[in-house]
A protein has these predicted regions:
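Ligand-binding loop in jelly-roll beta-barrel domains
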Residues: 176
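Non-heme Fe(II)-dependent double-stranded beta-helix
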Residues: 1-111
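Conserved metal-binding segment of the jelly-roll/cupin
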Residues: 158-173
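Short, solvent-exposed loop/turn segments at secondary-structure junctions
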Residues: 23-25, 87-90, 126-128, 140-141, ...
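Catalytic core of non-heme Fe(II) oxygenases with the double-stranded beta-helix
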Residues: 95-158
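Short hydrophobic-aromatic micro-motifs
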Residues: 17-18, 121, 165-167
Length: 176
């Protein structure tokens, strides 16, 4: 089962990183299968693979990982559904992804509610200089779009291969 500190951290900070969530051998399997489906997105300088659930059993296994289910159910409740399932690869030289929260956040009168959540699997190391995901801890509680200076308060989500990062959809996040 998922260590309780991750449930507490996602409530307090809006995100958590679970290290050693899967093996390096499994990361290799995921990478190999994912690269078969990657397509270049020349407009943003990234590679993407969409609709992964239908692309092979390994992607079904990933969606049903016990840590993934535990945190998504904590945030969204037992009747959640999988809306988007993509893989992406952003070279360090690619443009940043501006700070944002995920629709439908913010939604007036819904303070504290979570309508979506995200999980990122580190099939490679996410280092300080690799253009990692950025988050502003605690902003999932604000129920508003990011401030103009949000990036100045952001922290890098640095994690070793085999980790899973997850966050509340209202959390301000982007990419370096």
């Amino acid at each position: 089962h998922l260590p309780v500190e991750h449930l507490a951290r996602i409530e307090e900070d809006g995100y958590t990183v679970i290290e050693d969530a899967f093996s390096e051998a499994y990361a290799d399997e995921i990478h190999e299968e994912l690269m078969v489906h990657m397509e270049d997105d020349a407009t943003r300088g990234v590679q993407k693979a969409a609709m992964l659930l239908q692309r092979g059993p390994i992607f079904e296994e990933m969606a049903l990982h016990p840590y993934i289910l535990a945190l998504h159910q904590k945030l969204l409740g037992p009747d959640m559904n999988l809306a988007h399932y993509i893989g992406s690869r952003k070279p360090v030289v690619a443009d940043t992804h501006s700070m944002h929260n995920d629709p439908p956040h913010p939604a007036p009168g819904t303070e504290g509610a979570c309508f979506d959540s995200t999980a990122i699997w580190a099939i490679t190391d996410f280092g300080e200089d690799d253009g990692p995901t950025l988050v502003v801890p605690g902003t999932h509680k604000l129920n508003r779009k990011p401030d103009a200076d949000a990036i100045e308060r952001a922290v890098k989500v640095v994690m070793p291969r085999g980790s899973i990062a997850m966050w509340h959809g209202a959390l301000w996040h982007g990419a370096a």
